[in-house]
Amino acid sequence: MTGWESKSDNGQTHAINLGFAKTTGEIMAWINSDDIILPGTLSYIADYFNRHPKIDVVYGNRIQIDINDKQIGRWILPEHDNNVLSWTDFVPQETLYWRRSIWEKVGGRLDESFRFAMDWDFLVRLRDAGARFARLPRFMGGFRVHPKQKTSSEIGDIGLQEMNDIRLRLIGKIPTEREIFKAVKPYLIKHSFTDLIWRIRNAFGNPY
């Protein structure tokens, strides 16, 4: 760690922007205070970017943990799908990393009008700027689940409104849940298949 600052701000997104304004590195990410980066991830990401200079954005699988750091679930994702991003955000934020060059290309800031869906908005802006994504077959982050987290308490009001605003912008309307499910169903099938393959390999001592 090369710096630390604690002061009043205008919300989480503003605070993240303040932090990024002080950075100089070529690989960028943020981590929320509840969540964790899994051991070995940073060196793995640095090596991957060095070996794949044409990739702009990467993310990976997540584990879910409780307040005692006990693992309570997993997200094992299929290959990246740009089209699905118009309908929903499937990228685990705590596993997301990108190059500074693509950050600067999209303006070098998160949109501070978002309190909840700033990461989804950011992903869409990256996609629309031509960013090349890669989903990496590795558990890279841990997402903490507890009753008082912002994700749980506000998704029913502010979060839902922000997500609908993004969908309206991208597809021209606010779709029904049925329409969303129909649009993302092929991805969900791939998700289930990828999860099954992982469990089979893991059962035989060969997880990827």
Model region roles, listed by residue range:
Residues 7-23:
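Glycine-rich, basic loop-to-helix element that forms the pyrophosphate-binding segment
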Residues 168-208:
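Membrane-proximal basic amphipathic "stem/tether" segments
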Residues 76-166:
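Conserved nucleotide-sugar donor-binding catalytic segment
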Residues 40-72:
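Conserved donor NDP-sugar-binding/catalytic core segment of glycosyltransferases
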Residues 28:
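Short aromatic/hydrophobic "clamp" motif used to bind/position activated sugar donors
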Residues 12-16, 41, 94:
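Conserved donor sugar-nucleotide recognition element shared by glycan-biosynthetic enzymes
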Residues 32-36, 61:
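The conserved acidic donor/metal-binding loop of glycosyltransferases
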Residues 7, 57-62, 136, 143:
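Short glycine/serine/threonine-enriched helix-capping/active-site loop
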